[in-house]
């Protein structure tokens, strides 16, 4: 969508300062029911049409795009992939040459599950990058907060303390508070 590229262009320009030479390729996935976006190694960013529909204004969409750009700048997907490969290699060594394919499959699934999401630190770093890119691009700094508030409403409540303890993702409410603190400290609330 041309509008989405226009919104992303200044964010990508700001990200070049932190990761010169990186390329960013945006693809919209047609699924109005999915309110999600993700980044993968190589600068590929995927945004579901449901997220674009859910974003009420450019600042909300810019906030999400900037956050995903932050994952690429932080090399979070690449680091996750390297970690996953390392776990699979160690599993293969530990299982030995005599291991059945079934055992190898289990090891591979376990490796994928162990790194299925970005870490809490990765998410916070992507939020920091994203907030900076949004502000430097002239978008409302509270756009990402507003979008996370929508996600929180969609989630329909908070996680239990056990879910929070074992989650690699900070809770949406926690992320909202963290971003509000970042905005307050930066003095850029718009």
Task: Set out the residue ranges of the language-model regions.
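A Zn2+-metalloprotease active-site environment signal
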Residues: 3-190
């Amino acid at each position: 969508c041309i509008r989405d590229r226009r919104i992303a262009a200044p964010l990508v320009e700001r990200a070049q300062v932190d990761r010169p030479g990186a390329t960013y390729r945006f693809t919209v996935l047609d699924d109005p029911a999915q309110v999600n976006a993700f980044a993968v190694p190589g600068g590929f960013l995927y945004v579901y049409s449901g997220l674009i529909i859910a974003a009420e204004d450019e600042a909300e969409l810019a906030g999400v795009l900037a956050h995903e750009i932050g994952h690429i700048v932080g090399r979070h997907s690449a680091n996750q992939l390297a970690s996953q490969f390392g776990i699979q290699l160690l599993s293969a060594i530990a299982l030995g040459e005599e291991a059945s394919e079934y055992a190898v499959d289990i090891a591979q699934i376990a490796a994928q599950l162990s790194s299925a999401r970005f870490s809490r630190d990765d998410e916070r770093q992507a939020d920091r990058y994203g907030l900076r890119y949004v502000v430097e691009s002239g978008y409302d700094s509270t756009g990402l907060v507003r979008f996370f508030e929508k996600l929180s409403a969609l989630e329909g409540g908070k996680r239990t303390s056990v879910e929070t303890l074992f989650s690699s993702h900070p809770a949406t409410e926690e992320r909202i508070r963290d971003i509000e603190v970042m905005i307050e400290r930066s003095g850029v609330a718009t």
